[in-house]
């Protein structure tokens, strides 16, 4: 699967709040971090815990893709995230690094 297809698959799983399919897109030793900042999570199990909480606390959570660019194994998404009616809404850049058909790292800017 190419990098763009993988990122789309994880975005679709995120929007469906399908935790197993979402986590399956990530490498066992994946890293989530703030762009030019601290690492937020390391490893698939930490990712599972984080997003299980996110999905439980935000049942109407939805991300809309505003734009996407790719350069090799790097995919950058511009996303609009809505937590639900009357809840927090924000835009984010998600910079995905894909290795061996899995997401190895995501750096977020918001």
Q: Which residues fall in each region the model found?
A:
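Short, aromatic-enriched amphipathic alpha-helices that serve as compact interaction elements
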Residues: 1-17
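A beta-strand edge to alpha-helix "cap/lid" segment located at domain peripheries
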Residues: 2, 15, 33, 39-41, ...
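Alpha-helical elements of Rossmann-like donor-binding domains used by nucleotide-donor carbohydrate transfer enzymes
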Residues: 9, 21, 46-50
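Short, well-ordered alpha-helical segments enriched in acidic and aromatic residues
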Residues: 16-31
